[in-house]
Amino acid sequence: MAKNALLLALAVLTILYIAVWIVYLRRTFSPDAPKEKVKLAPQLGIGFFANFMDTLGVGSFALTSSIYKLFGLVQDDLIPGTMNVGHALPTAAEAFIFIGAAIVPVEFPTLISMIAAAVVGAWVGAGTVSKWPKRRIQIGMGIALFCGALLMLGSILGWLPGGGTALGLSGRNLLIAVFFNFMFGALQQLGIGLYAPCMILIYLMGMNQLAAFPIMMGSCAFLMPVGGFRFIKEARYSPKAAIGLAIGGIPGVLLAYYVVKSLPLLYVRWLVVFVVLYTSAMLLRSAATESAAEANSRSHAPEPAGK
């Protein structure tokens, strides 16, 4: 019953998200609006590949942000918004599949509390990030990707906790979990995926490993449309790139879950760690270059008259 209610709420939110996005897209692609130089075909491929790998366990945010930065496909300051807007629908598809197939029944108060916390965090985080200047976003994403690479490395090397048997939390432990999921929802708006830190949190709280999936999937599926709303409203994303991620991503999810199901991904995960670390360094270097250029511009600015 609780699962059905959750899936119904997700369906309503997803439909609302699509409707709002279409309204804004009609304005974006009106005859008078400036034309984007982004090409749709590569974005479809990125959406397919990133969400295919996401369904198999390699995060779509790390892959997408790395590809965008390495190949210069989307402006640095538009990457967080583009990922949150574009990956929202494929993530909803993942959530419908994984929550619908969930074998372990997570206690409803725990599930709802953690999802709600992530959603509020996303709303606050997106409202903040969507107003940040380019340099601050570069620094934030650089740090976020570095942290994400460390989490992936910990997963590969088996450093992460193993979990327990609990199917729910109460009292102080629930409050702690809610607080941290709020923070994870906010941080996702910068590009650090919620899955890995949320999974670690659930394991540290002594919960069943399988309980992580409905909580993670539910949190991301609900928080991404909410965060996406703010990026769409502030026009801090690439519309054409986000469309490509969404359209290409859903078939990637379906193919990975229903056809491929599993792959030997150890070497892929190692490659992703190195690529993400390199991308993190590139973003921080870009931020330093931007800062130096601003300082140089200020030093050469003419002094106000009368001094």
Name the predicted role of every residue range.
Residues 1-50, 99-190, 203-204, 209, ...:
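Juxtamembrane transmembrane-helix boundary motif
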Residues 56-65, 190-199:
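Transmembrane helix boundary and interhelical junction motifs in multipass membrane proteins
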Residues 63, 123-124, 197, 229, ...:
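Residue-level hotspots within transmembrane alpha-helices of multi-pass secondary transporters
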Residues 69, 199-206:
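Short amphipathic helix-loop junctions that connect adjacent transmembrane helices
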Residues 72-85, 109, 206-217, 240:
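Membrane-interface alpha-helices at helix entry/exit sites of multi-pass transporters
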Residues 81-97, 219-225, 251-252:
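Membrane-embedded alpha-helical segments of transport systems
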